[in-house]
């Protein structure tokens, strides 16, 4: 699967966070003194994020290494001729990612935590209407469900050139991907569906993250070496005659 943003996608660059941070009395919280100016009002025309700095909460969390990213991809696609039947369907994906820089949080140099959550929406045009092998959009998946995606710990070493990652991983985030294909919708532009179609349950790819470990050595901005070991049956043993 290519992690792409189609033209119909709605990109949200922030999420609401309802922790009653101002009700706390910890001395570690930021406070204004009489000599400090009041915070300026958030302005959507100049802010880097859609919902501003959440009244100062976003930069406070950033000081502790915590950041959020929320993306909503929405597609309305259809089959007008041939295939199984004709019709149009909606499919979408809500992608929430939370990152924590452990160096900022607890002083763990080179450490990072990452969690991805998926909210899969709508119907699958490929299965229900077309009957094709390579999915019409790269967010298609059944059933519609909220589930955990990637969740891993990473340690950076060798002046940040070597990364060791362990946890729940998706192979289609690391292999056989072209950055220039990320603007396209059809999954043929991303991770090879022919490879996924020949693995039980589609293999360790979206939306089924599996236990694994990965090492990546960055030689420079253009060259890197990646090696990993992952569970190849993310949905359990196959019930086919091959009995994977």
Placement of each model-derived feature along the sequence:
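Short loop/turn motifs that connect adjacent beta-strands in outer-membrane beta-barrel proteins
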Residues: 45, 52-68, 101-113, 158-161, ...
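Sec/Tat signal peptide C-region and signal peptidase I cleavage site
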Residues: 19-23
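Surface-exposed coil loops of outer-membrane beta-barrel proteins
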Residues: 125-152, 160-244
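N-terminal regions that are enriched for targeting/export leaders
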Residues: 25-81
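Residues that define the transmembrane beta-barrel architecture of outer-membrane proteins
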Residues: 50-51, 64, 78, 88-94, ...
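Bacterial N-terminal signal peptides
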Residues: 7-17
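Outer-membrane beta-barrel architecture
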Residues: 56-58, 97-99, 152-154, 214
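Transmembrane beta-barrel strands of outer-membrane/channel proteins
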Residues: 68-76, 113-119, 164-170, 225-231
């Amino acid at each position: 699967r290519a992690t792409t943003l189609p033209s119909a996608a709605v990109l949200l660059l922030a999420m609401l966070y309802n922790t009653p941070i101002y009700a706390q009395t910890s001395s570690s919280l930021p406070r204004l003194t009489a000599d400090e100016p009041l915070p300026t009002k958030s302005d959507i025309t100049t802010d880097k994020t859609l919902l501003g700095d959440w009244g100062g909460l976003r930069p406070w969390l950033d000081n502790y290494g915590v950041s959020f990213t929320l993306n909503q991809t929405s597609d309305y696609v259809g089959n007008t001729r041939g295939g199984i039947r004709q019709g149009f369907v909606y499919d979408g994906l809500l992608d929430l990612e939370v990152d924590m820089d452990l160096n900022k949080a607890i002083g763990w140099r080179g450490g990072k935590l990452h969690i991805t959550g998926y909210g899969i929406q709508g119907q699958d045009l490929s299965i229900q209407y077309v009957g094709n092998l390579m999915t019409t959009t790269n967010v298609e998946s059944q059933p519609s469900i909220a589930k955990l995606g990637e969740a891993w710990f990473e340690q950076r070493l060798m002046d940040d050139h070597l990364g060791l990652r362990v946890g729940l991983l998706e192979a289609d985030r690391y292999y056989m991907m072209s950055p220039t294909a990320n603007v396209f919708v059809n999954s043929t532009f991303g991770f090879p569906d022919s490879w996924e179609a020949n693995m039980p349950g589609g293999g360790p790819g979206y939306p089924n993250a599996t236990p694994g470990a990965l090492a990546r050595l960055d030689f420079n901005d253009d060259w890197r070496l990646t090696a990993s070991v992952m569970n190849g049956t993310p949905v359990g043993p196959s019930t086919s005659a091959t009995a994977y």
